Amino acid sequence: MEITTINQLIAAGSGLIGACIGAGISGWINFRISRSNHDIEKLSFAAGFVAEVESLQKVMRERGYLEAFTSLSNDPDIVAGAKVHYTILIPDNFSRFYNANLNKVGLLGVDRTKLLVQYHQVLQALAQDFKEGSYVNMNGFDKEAIDECIRFFSLALSIGDQIVNYEVGN
């Protein structure tokens, strides 16, 4: 082989190796940027979901719904079979962030996603009892319906607390 051919092969090989190294570094940098953006997105949505749960928890606690129903459950007239009408105005869109970002719920991980979906399903079940035209809205809450609301308010508050106090390492 001639010297010029060897020099050309060395130059071509060096160029090819350099291109491979450059592509590898570029790919790694793009991967890191993409991963960083994904992590930021996860944190952002997690913060939004948790903030909404905290707000809903605060409203339920500040308004004393659980305590009110517990008091009603122990009322002698209710125990004797009377019914009571109890109204809570619940907007259809009480969980706006959750509804607007349902496609991002999975970013929270399996356990936290499960809790978040359960939480909102329990709240939806509660909200149905207070909707205009629902059976208990029209006929009143008897002891059984009141006790069911107590269970659902307790369950919602318990699940909500688990979401708010969830440790990411779990």
Label each residue range with its predicted role.
Residues A47-N170:
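Interfacial alpha-helical end/capping and short helix-turn segments at domain and membrane boundaries
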Residues R32-E54:
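Juxtamembrane membrane-water interface segments immediately C-terminal to a transmembrane helix
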Residues M1-S36:
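Membrane-embedded hydrophobic alpha-helical segments
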